[in-house]
Amino acid sequence: MTETKEEKVHKVFEKISPSYDRMNSVISFKLHVKWRKETMKLMRVQKGTNVLDVCCGTADWSIMMAEEIGPEGHVTGLDFSENMLKVGREKVKEADLHNVELIHGNAMELPFPDNSFDYVTIGFGLRNVPDYMQVLREMYRVLKPGGQLACIDTSQPNIPGWKQVFNAYFRYVMPVFGKFFAKSYKEYSWLQESTREFPGMSKLAEMFQDAGFSYVRYISHSGGASATHFGFKKKE
């Protein structure tokens, strides 16, 4: 029987969870931290707000958001990999944060009522879901009117030369790093496939609009290696 994308992704992240944080730093040369900080600055997050971090993984962005909104706010992190959540819960505990809850769930069917959150974030997770549009629509649904979505993910560089280098790096070098640092050549080979198949910046912006978002914009990071897309749910 052929594995579905959802089953394959779940198996990948259950296996790589112990080395995920270290590999993120190796693969991106720690640039993922810079990209997230740049995104946070542009979001202008307000204190005391309610946040959902979809595909939260090991909770890096959940923790950053919790520190930003302060003790009066609340962050819910959701992921479908219990092993990733286990790592995340340890990090939340070490950070001594009491305004973060990490739950097991499916981004395709968010277990929350409509209009629940002031902010929704998803970092390096959208490319791994079975249906991009379904997840975008779900995130739109749970946002409050006036709420903001921020999505960071890999992208497709357009700069001649850099595009070829980027593609070669993800296709040939990243799986080798995965084998050397995490003993997971097969898993990191698959992750480069998800990167290659993910829509480019302008196409993803169109998908945001199709899902209902307004005032959609995006910024590229590191020559288009990554991008952040922003969208708002219009006030009623």
Curated annotation (Swiss-Prot):
Pathway: Quinol/quinone metabolism; menaquinone biosynthesis; menaquinol from 1,4-dihydroxy-2-naphthoate: step 2/2. Keywords: Menaquinone biosynthesis, Methyltransferase, S-adenosyl-L-methionine, Transferase. S-adenosyl-L-methionine binds at residues 58, 79, 106-107. One of its GO terms (molecular function) is demethylmenaquinone methyltransferase activity. It catalyses: a 2-demethylmenaquinol + S-adenosyl-L-methionine = a menaquinol + S-adenosyl-L-homocysteine + H(+). Its EC number is 2.1.1.163. InterPro entries: MenG_heptapren, SAM-dependent_MTases_sf, UbiE/COQ5_MeTrFase, UbiE/COQ5_MeTrFase_CS. One of its GO terms (biological process) is menaquinone biosynthetic process. It comes from the Bacteria. Methyltransferase required for the conversion of demethylmenaquinol (DMKH2) to menaquinol (MKH2). Belongs to the class I-like SAM-binding methyltransferase superfamily. MenG/UbiE family. NCBIfam families: MenG_heptapren (TIGR02752), MenG_MenH_UbiE (TIGR01934), PRK00216.1-4 (NF001243), PRK00216.1-5 (NF001244). This is Demethylmenaquinone methyltransferase. It comes from Listeria welshimeri serovar 6b (strain ATCC 35897 / DSM 20650 / CCUG 15529 / CIP 8149 / NCTC 11857 / SLCC 5334 / V8).
